[in-house]
Amino acid sequence: MASMGTLAFDEYGRPFLIIKDQDRKSRLMGLEALKSHIMAAKAVANTMRTSLGPNGLDKMMVDKDGDVTVTNDGATILSMMDVDHQIAKLMVELSKSQDDEIGDGTTGVVVLAGALLEEAEQLLDRGIHPIRIADGYEQAARVAIEHLDKISDSVLVDIKDTEPLIQTAKTTLGSKVVNSCHRQMAEIAVNAVLTVADMERRDVDFELIKVEGKVGGRLEDTKLIKGVIVDKDFSHPRMPKKVEDAKIAILTCPFEPPKPKTKHKLDVTSVEDYKALQKYEKEKFEEMIQQIKETGANLAICQWGFDDEANHLLLQNNLPAVRWVGGPEIELIAIATGGRIVPRFSELTAEKLGFAGLVQEISFGTTKDKMLVIEQCKNSRAVTIFIRGGNKMIIEEAKRSLHDALCVIRNLIRDNRVVYGGGAAETSCALAVSQEADKCPTLEQYAMRAFADALEVIPMALSENSGMNPIQTMTEVRARQVKEMNPALGIDCLHKGTNDMKQQHVIETLIGKKQQISLATQMVRMILKIDDIRKPGESEE
């Protein structure tokens, strides 16, 4: 028999055993590995659980540089979380997948995955094989998704009647920092999406929706601008602050005299040479300005800078200009104004000019901050949501909240079917899965019942976060759903006196809810199939 370790004695002569390679042992196998994975996933899910619903709490995340972010957006919390365990990293990826595909429901998907693993742990303790649990979960997920199709309702996606879209956006924004003015934010999000939406293809190009923010003012001062906002001002303080009926030259070429492409050297040996060079530069600038004016342009927007002499000449020639405008903004301005980006000065013609009814410089409070607003554009399919707020953190959180709302409205344009929130859809699915489990003759029925119990964790977390007794509230809602045959009954988180989520207008998209169940189940199946953790350099012992 091989030696297990080394026998040693302490200072009092008492023997103890130093087990061989104990300090280097990090490999986990079998049930021990599964329990470790489940524990890590549960830790992440429990962190997220308190952020669920309209009464969910925010998290303060501090990064390595000391920058603070306050948010209750699941994807943001997890992306900023410092996690070492590989399974916890998978939970972060799960949330990111939900965010990339749907844009909302990132907290719920993690809480559901954590609940499924918690239930799986109890089944493992009872001796059920992980593969049987995974198969049972797969069957249950199929039943739940089919049931969601049966209980879903269709909403009218119409530009003239936007109320159903606004109510769905309000549900998403209800748990965010903007919930004090979530009606206004929902209307802004709906109007922005419907402005840029391509109803024939049933799709929305988010590149056409720009979200800008500026510290100062209140959240209620947030507005939708049918045009583009650029964080720049006119290049000279004496240029006019407002240009009406603007014909815009959009330049990506440097506003300076042409230079040879090859390496060159200019010898200036006298004052006359220097004056001649200065005169040449001035003539060239005047020629360029004249070329712009001949096309009919009365505003130049330049991606590159120009020196003070050129700036002064622009002022003398009554040609307002903006310099150092970034590439994405240049593209948006071109789309909005119907202009063409000009990469070479020689290619500038009247046909390539953009048009805007009004270009004006706006200033904020007592600060020197200024921004340029380009509105009444030729093509109104480019919009900007301009957010105001008391501090940078509120503005950043409002941006994240609006992103979720925009995604939800886009999903409704793609598929106009909805289910009811407040845990109503999960409770109804749990009842359907339980009924189906009773018909299952194999061992998988235990996993299906566990799946039903895990689905009920969402409504229980909602009631817990709202200060109610979770078990009592959940029992009442479940009993009423069975008795009244009404799948729209959920948790009355806002204490409005009714559990009917249809009356409360708590609406969630069907594709978002389906994706939550599918992704959480796939993730849990994958974790249940891992029984060994190997790291580089480990021996076979």
From Swiss-Prot:
Gene3D superfamilies: GroEL, GroEL-like equatorial domain, TCP-1-like chaperonin intermediate domain. The keyword Ubl conjugation applies. Ubiquitinated by the DCX(DCAF12) complex specifically recognizes the diglutamate (Glu-Glu) at the C-terminus, leading to its degradation. ADP binds at G53, G105, T106, T107, S175, G422, D492, E508, K513. It catalyses: ATP + H2O = ADP + phosphate + H(+). GO terms for biological process: positive regulation of telomere maintenance via telomerase; protein stabilization. It holds the Pfam family Cpn60_TCP1. Component of the chaperonin-containing T-complex (TRiC), a hexadecamer composed of two identical back-to-back stacked rings enclosing a protein folding chamber. Each ring is made up of eight different subunits: TCP1/CCT1, CCT2, CCT3, CCT4, CCT5, CCT6A/CCT6, CCT7, CCT8. Interacts with PACRG. Interacts with DNAAF4. Interacts with DLEC1. Interacts with SPMAP2. Component of the chaperonin-containing T-complex (TRiC), a molecular chaperone complex that assists the folding of actin, tubulin and other proteins upon ATP hydrolysis. The TRiC complex mediates the folding of WRAP53/TCAB1, thereby regulating telomere maintenance. As part of the TRiC complex may play a role in the assembly of BBSome, a complex involved in ciliogenesis regulating transports vesicles to the cilia. This is T-complex protein 1 subunit epsilon. The gene is CCT5.
